Amino acid sequence: MHIIGIGTDITECPRIGRMIQDHGELFLRRVYTEREIDYCNSRKQSTEHFAGRWAAKEAVLKALGTGWIRGISWRDVEIRNNPSGAPLVLLHAGTRDIAESRGVRQVLVTISHCRTYATAYAVALAQENLPPIVPSHFDDDIPF
């Protein structure tokens, strides 16, 4: 496997808490899958877990090199947990299509959070030795 993209994000837990308080189910169902909502609500500090998943979704899209382009929704990136509790990335719909078109075979993610902040780091991996994703505006000058 070869790294073709990395991404990181940090978000304020109280900000996500306010979004949940102000917009309730509308916000939750727009951003999180049913499984994510169930998982976070089952945790003692649910706001921190929602914020961690928010940061993870942002980090994954940065690792894929897409950002929030048309055709991608929050729910297209799902963060679940493997049996040992480690976060696991599942890609759906437009996000999955973009990842496959770029040769991505796996996205790894790690999440940390406290009362104030949640942070996540993601790595997109390809099976083949593909070149890194370079924005078209760089043309001949490839950044290192």
Regions found by a protein language model. Name each.
Residues 1-144:
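Core catalytic alpha/beta fold that binds nucleotide/phospho-ligands
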